[in-house]
A protein has these predicted regions:
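Short, surface-exposed linear patches
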Residues: 42-47, 91, 130-135
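Short, low-order "capping/linker" segments at domain edges
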Residues: 149-169
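M16 family metallopeptidases and their MPP-like homologs
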Residues: 86-129
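Low-complexity, compositionally biased segments
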Residues: 30, 42, 118-119, 134, ...
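His/Glu-rich zincin catalytic helix
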Residues: 1-86, 124-127
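Acidic/histidine-enriched alpha-helical segments
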Residues: 133-156
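Long, C-terminal folded domains that constitute the functional core of proteins
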Residues: 113, 130-131, 163-166
Length: 169
């Protein structure tokens, strides 16, 4: 963990069929996603809302995206990251997110893979991006009264604009 991270991988196990990662959340304020986070995530992971997802609100990740755990968002971003570079058009990746210890803000994310190195890189990128999104949200909370973020119209709705962040991969 770096000194100011809000989410990080605490432990990873590579199994023959999946990666199991323990994801630590820094504090309770960082546990859940928000609509703004999802809008920004869609710039990098445009198919997130269409992922099949077992949940209490619908059949896709979109049904819960703006009110789910950040660890669950990491799962879906890591899966989409793998799908992007997958060797087969019919590749199917599955994942599961659960709380290993909710009181200690420790989640367990499991994702299947074709190539373990691609899966690990996708997981790393997803965690770094989730941390960036949480930092943006935190900064927005502390900068009340400053100039608003640039917005754009998408499907008739105003949303945060797409952006680039430096990647030191």
């Amino acid at each position: 963990m770096s000194g100011s991270s809000r989410v990080w991988v605490e432990h990873v196990t590579v199994r023959p069929d999946r990666i199991v990662a323990d994801i630590r959340i820094a504090d309770e304020a960082c546990v859940l996603t928000s609509e703004d986070m999802i809008d920004k995530a869609l710039c990098r992971y445009p198919h997130l809302l269409d992922h099949a997802c077992v949940n209490d609100w619908g059949e896709t990740f979109g049904a819960v995206a703006s009110r789910t755990s950040v660890a669950h968002l990491v799962e879906h971003m890591a899966i989409e990251g793998q799908a992007r570079v997958s060797s087969g058009a019919k590749s199917l990746f599955v994942g599961k997110t659960s709380w290993a210890n909710r009181a200690k803000l420790l989640a367990r994310v499991e994702i299947s893979y074709e190539d373990d190195l691609v899966a690990l890189a996708s997981l790393r990128a997803a965690v770094l991006f989730a941390d960036y999104l949480l930092a943006e949200r935190e900064e927005a909370r502390f900068c009340v009264g400053e100039a608003p973020l640039k917005t754009e119209k998408r499907n008739g709705n105003e949303s945060a604009g797409c952006f680039r962040i430096p990647y030191n991969g």
